[in-house]
Amino acid sequence: MAHRILRDHEADGWERSDFPIICESCLGDNPYVRMTKANYDKECKICTRPFTVFRWRPGRDARYKKTEICQTCCKLKNVCQVCLLDLEYGLPVQVRDTALNISTHDSIPKSDVNREYFAEEHDRKARAGLDYESSFGKMRPNDTILKLQRTTPYYKRNRAHVCSFFIRGECTRGAECPYRHEMPETGELSQQNIKDRYYGVNDPVAMKLLGKAGEMGTLESPDDESIKTLYVGGLNSRILEQDIRDQFYAHGEIESIRILADKACAFVTYTSREGAEKAAQELSNRLVINGQRLKLTWGRPKPDQDGANQQGGVAHSGLLPRAVISQQHNQPPPMQQYYMHPPPANQDKPYYPSMDPQRMGAVISTQEAGGSSTENNGASSSSYMMPPHQSYPPPPYGYMPSPYQQQYPPNHHHQPSPMQHYAPPPAAYPYPQQPGPGSRPAPSPTAVSAISPDSAPAGSGAPSGSSQQAPDVSTATGSSQ
């Protein structure tokens, strides 16, 4: 062609754009995305014309993604430039066309010349301001679309590819390898072709989804005619009571709507059984509120309130489990074991022996002791129970106990008067002290004991230590005799 030789980009139909047409799953969950743009970098895999390629990383653990087809082919099928799924429902082209009864297999030519001419005609209409876009979004979805459509992004699709060296056992990168160290999945889903996905022919993913839609059954009504309540599960904070009422009111008059926020569910009760059956038939497997797919089933009848209250009241009235107490509710209680204290009557909490404040080592107040403070002759209001200081039987196996002074601390209730002095026994000095050079010899114990305290002169110049030590020794000696 002459315009190909002139290299006129606009006349040749080469695409030049500023932003790609992609779905939310391919864009990723990161609000700050850095894209690189390369004009006329690759050729479209459908029409084989050069186009602008965008490349970015959807997330931290995702692989780099890039556009695969041009925007002209993307607008003809209303699909994403990367994954080639429908932009509105997130389904393959074959599933969407089958559900909406659209035959687009022969509308787009497949030969090189006819395909290029077809694309140039659509580009010419777009430059002229004519509406050439498809009417896929203008059609009303049917039951199959509502059952299979994706309401939330699927970011797992952006994971890295499987490492081929890891499959052969030759990967030396270890944890630093940017690819997944997993075994690949084999089967029909692993054999996919981008052209079959675009034209909607022999797509294994579409075959699986269509088979799943055929297996979905309707919601069967329960045999109990008194049940008029429907259970709605999978709620979130964005769904309000008015949203649920607007969705269910078209099928019958609603008696009440009860929302349990902590359990993310709601119960819709109709005034008649016919309204509940109609809502279950119309909304089964296709209940979507505010973009959130919800689960719809029949509600169960409430349990007996009297039996539940009686069982709950018996559950906390003793030490035995609930099952044993319920069995013994109409029977006399068995005899208590010898090592178990019988629980007091009419108690709300269990009783254990360790809860008795009269046990050894517990702090007993004046009121709990019951007049014990009067017997102690002005003792403190609370005291620790100490073991009595008395003789104990000898321990077995020839164990020699420690001296009495080391067993228990001295009793501080009776303090000695300041005038009383206790001298060490004579056994504390087994040997006489040797006089050193230039010191006076110490008097013998007999000489000290013979001297009377009254015979010592009042104004003598004896050292204070010797004059005070003699009366102490004599007192101790006299008391020992």
UniProtKB/Swiss-Prot annotation:
Region feature Disordered, mapped onto this chain: 329-481
GO CC annotations, alphabetized: nucleus
Record's keyword terms, sorted: DNA-binding, Metal-binding, RNA-binding, Zinc, Zinc-finger
GO BP term, example: defense response to bacterium
SMART domains xref list: RRM, ZnF_C3H1
Biased composition (Pro residues): 331-345, 423-444
Bias-annotated ranges (Low complexity): 369-389, 399-410, 449-471
Sequence intervals crossing the membrane: none
Stretches annotated zinc finger (C3H1-type): 157-184
Domain RRM: 228-301
Family matches, as PANTHER family: PRE-MRNA-SPLICING FACTOR RBM22 (PTHR14089), ZINC FINGER CCCH DOMAIN-CONTAINING PROTEIN 4-RELATED (PTHR14089:SF12)
UniProt protein name: Zinc finger CCCH domain-containing protein 4
Protein source organism: Arabidopsis thaliana
